[in-house]
Swiss-Prot record:
Family: Belongs to the GGGP/HepGP synthase family. Group II subfamily.
One GO term of the biological process aspect: glycerophospholipid biosynthetic process
The protein, known as: Geranylgeranylglyceryl phosphate synthase
Species annotation: Pyrobaculum aerophilum (strain ATCC 51768 / DSM 7523 / JCM 9630 / CIP 104966 / NBRC 100827 / IM2)
Main EC class the enzyme belongs to: transferase
Lineage: Archaea, Thermoproteota, Thermoprotei, Thermoproteales, Thermoproteaceae
Compartments reported by the entry: Cytoplasm
């Protein structure tokens, strides 16, 4: 089974580890694995070198039996030690660089230097607060109250041919992506749907999981309260 097929199966939980924030990333990974996470995302918006990414991926794969996937915030965040990469295009950025400019450069880098990476083309749609990702990518986040706009972006992503849509409320967001927005996007997009940002309790995770996204991501929670990961994972599995 390749990574894309793995992502399509059911509703999975992935833990996002940002090496720029997480000095003790192995401790977080161990907590996540013990909690039953289905995969690890590695990446961040700022300050990560290629050598740092490679070492983090190598270390985590040494203790993990789940996919380790790159979630790159820049062109330096690539390594073929990972199982795959979310090849992100920030659809609601106001700067063409984050929609297609960086992707042109990244595509050449992957083809030349990381050909073993499984590439998952991903429409990255930033909503609500947007967090650091929204600020860095100069995005115009979709309001929480407009699931119809999010669905329109997802429909465009479907017609363009993206393999995945990632609804992002932002790192440490005050609110998660609302379930009704997840529902609207799920109806518009038939392939892999990923939801992340602001998911801080089992109750929230369960409400989102009931709308049948393929992946629910927690990051800040894993950094600040890793002992709560078990509650989140159980809620997703029981939804």
């Amino acid at each position: 089974m390749n990574l894309y097929e793995y992502l399509l199966e059911g509703v999975r939980h992935f833990t996002l580890i940002d090496p720029d924030k997480s000095v003790d990333y192995l401790k977080i990974a161990k907590y996540a694995l013990e909690a039953g996470t289905d995969g690890i995302l590695i990446g961040g918006s700022l300050g990560i070198r290629e050598s740092q990414i490679a070492q983090v991926v190598k270390d985590i794969k040494n203790i993990s039996n789940v996919p380790v996937v790159l979630f790159p915030g820049s062109l330096t965040q690539l390594t073929d030690l990972a199982d795959g990469v979310l090849f992100l295009s920030v659809l609601n950025s106001l700067d063409p660089y984050f929609i297609i400019g960086a992707q042109i450069q990244g595509a050449v880098l992957i083809a030349k230097h990381y050909p073993r990476l499984e590439v998952i083309s991903t429409a990255y749609i930033i909503v609500g607060d947007g967090g650091a990702a929204g600020f860095v990518s100069m995005s115009k986040p979709i309001p929480y109250t407009r699931p119809d706009i999010a669905a329109a972006y997802a429909l465009a992503a479907n017609y363009i041919g993206f393999k995945a849509v990632y609804l992002e409320a932002g790192s440490g967001a005050s609110q998660p992506v609302p379930p009704e927005m997840v529902r609207a996007v799920r109806r518009a997009f038939p392939r892999v749907l990923i939801v992340g940002g602001g998911i801080k309790s089992g109750e929230i995770a369960r409400a989102i999981a009931r709308e049948r996204p393929n992946v629910i991501v927690t990051g800040t929670l894993a950094e600040e309260s890793p002992e709560k990961l078990g509650e989140i994972v159980r809620a997703i599995k029981q939804a």
